[in-house]
Each structure stands twice: as structure tokens, then as C-alpha cells.
Amino acid sequence: MPLNRVREAIEAIKKGEMIIMMDDEDRENEGDLVYAAAFSTPEKVNFMVSEAKGLVCVCVTSTCSDRLGLAPMVRENNSQHETAFTVSIDARECSTGISAFERDLTIRKMVDGTSKPEDFVRPGHIFPLIAKEGGVLVRTGHTEGSVDICKLAGVAPVAVICEIIKKDGHMARRDDLMEFAKEHHLKIVYISDLIEYRMQNEMLILIKERSEVEFLGKRAERYVFQDHHRREHTLYAFGKIIDNSLVKYHTVGKDLSLLESEKKYSTLMQAIKKIQEENGLIIFMDTPQNAAPQIKDFGIGAQMLRFLGIKNFRLLTSEENREYVGLSGFGLNVTEKIVLQGGPIQL
């Protein structure tokens, strides 16, 4: 069923049709209208504005963003999902830029491979979003999902998306979206579907090293993985790896923030002690300096667990309300969340 949904969505995108994209089939989530920018028309833009009512955005690759000179909207992105907005733009030929016709003009110029930065003015009425390299296998967002579906359809990887809002002004949820799809004859695809579809043939990690080591006084199996950016991530497994193991992810920066914060240090030490006691796994994820961990940016760590044959796991976390979208697409399931409270600890 998930793979059939992806195939149907791909065919719809190829034909220039709109689809609805949601996170997971079994979650109460929001949805976006999506279509390939290569097939943009004023009528499609007007449908988004009048029927979906959300913000019309255009999702692009980093290559396209660089070519068009799209600078980040803010220097420090502290939004909940760290959505990669750039400065808004209009095509230079636009007057106000807000009509469906002029927004369509801007969209079509964005997908035109000959367009240059000077062909646009800033700010404007189209909001570009930059998809992460690696797509939904790295970040499970609608930005990445919409670009991925365009790539899978064999069209230019530029997608137009818009959140769907109900007539009463609230966000449309699963049942509302199902009704919307039925009313307008639209296909539905989930981020988790795309992950599962791509995982049939793709893997963004490789294992570089496996060895027996001593980790803070206890024997462990160490696995070193390399991702598509050539960053290395290290996993320590204490005892035999079994299904429903206790797992902790820890983001490793290149600075000394861990030593500068007693709370961060204590929380990590508490996590290590609990993982060792329960023969679990701790994964140290390498990230660029000063890059904050993103809520949806966990695909590489998910692939590491899948590589080791884990399907179900208990998650040790310091963020009780953090959501992990699309896990089912990786063949993973969090059976329990155990929340850490940082504080003094004796090892």
C-alpha cells in the first residue's frame, strides 16, 4: 500500500497534477498541497490561495538556491522545525507580485535553468525553501518530500507547496484532508511512504569500522559510520544488540559547549550510565559547528539502527515533546520514551 501510494503520486506529479502530502498515515497531522513547479499555471496558484489558504512556498535544492542567489531569511533560525526559508522574491517583471498570475510568473522563472539572481527582486511574495541534500532520508520534512517526489517523477526538482487550512481558519487534520482529497480528486502520499520507497534502493551511510573497545570502564562494540557528507558518526553497543533496546542519540559539535554547561554534561553522563546498565546503544551524531539539531533531521541515525537490524526501540531523551516524523518509513518504532532530567550524578 505505501509503495502504491508513492507510485500513484509520482504519476500524478508527472502529469502536472496536485497531490496532498502528510507526515505519517497513523498520526493526526497537517498536510500540504504539492505540485511540480515545471507545470505551474496561474490557475494552480489561485487554487492554492483560494482553497488551501496557506502560505505559497517553492521548495528548491541547494544547487538551485545558489544559482538564484537565495540568501537565508534570518541569520539564526530558531523556529521549532528550523524550516529553511530564504528571503522572499518576485520576478523582476512583476508589478505588485501578489496576483496568482505574477506569483506563477515568479515560480516559472525559478524553475527556468537560465534564470539568474538579477532576474528577481527582494523581498517579494514567493517564499523559497531549501531542501536538505539527501531528502527525506536525512530530514523528514515536506520541503524534502516535495523535492524528492519531483526527482522521482523525473521533473525539475522544484516544487510548489501550500498548507491546507479549513474554512474556519484552523489547520486541516487527517480527516479534513481525506475529505479535501476526495472533493478535489487528489492523490495522497505520506513522508513515511517516500522514506520506505527510497529505502528499497538507497542508503546514505556506510560502515567504516567495527571494533571492541572499553568505554568508561565497560566493554562495548563500536561502529563508525560515514554519511553522504563524509561526516562520521559513532555508535556504542553495550551487550548483545536486541530488539527493543534502549537507545540514546547525542549530537556532537566541534566546540566545547558540553564542558561549558554542567547541565549538558550531567545529562550526558546520566544517559551513558543508564545505557550501560541496560546494555543499550548510544549514538554520537557529528554535526557542523554551531548547527542546532533539527527535530526532523534524524534520518542518518535511523539508518544506523536499521543497519543493525533494530525495528523497535526505547528512546532515552531529554526532550519529552520532541516528535519523530516518518519513523515507520525506516521500519522503526519507538515503543517508549524515557525522559532524562539533568543533574549531579555519580559514575
From Swiss-Prot:
It comes from Wolinella succinogenes (strain ATCC 29543 / DSM 1740 / CCUG 13145 / JCM 31913 / LMG 7466 / NCTC 11488 / FDC 602W) (Vibrio succinogenes). SUPFAM superfamilies: RibA-like, YrdC/RibB. The lineage of its organism: Bacteria, Pseudomonadati, Campylobacterota, Epsilonproteobacteria, Campylobacterales. Mg(2+) 1 binds at residue 28. It catalyses: D-ribulose 5-phosphate = (2S)-2-hydroxy-3-oxobutyl phosphate + formate + H(+). Binds 2 divalent metal cations per subunit. Magnesium or manganese. One of its GO terms (biological process) is riboflavin biosynthetic process. InterPro entries: DHBP_synth_RibB-like_a/b_dom, DHBP_synthase_RibB, GTP_cyclohydro_II, RibA-like_sf. It holds the Pfam family DHBP_synthase. This is 3,4-dihydroxy-2-butanone 4-phosphate synthase. Transmembrane segments: none annotated. Keywords: Lyase, Magnesium, Manganese, Metal-binding, Riboflavin biosynthesis. Its cofactor is Mg(2+); Mn(2+). Residues 201-347 are annotated as: GTP cyclohydrolase II-like. GO terms for molecular function: 3,4-dihydroxy-2-butanone-4-phosphate synthase activity; GTP cyclohydrolase II activity; magnesium ion binding; manganese ion binding. Catalyzes the conversion of D-ribulose 5-phosphate to formate and 3,4-dihydroxy-2-butanone 4-phosphate. Residues 1-200 are annotated as: DHBP synthase. Pathway: Cofactor biosynthesis; riboflavin biosynthesis; 2-hydroxy-3-oxobutyl phosphate from D-ribulose 5-phosphate: step 1/1. Mg(2+) 2 binds at residues 28, 142.
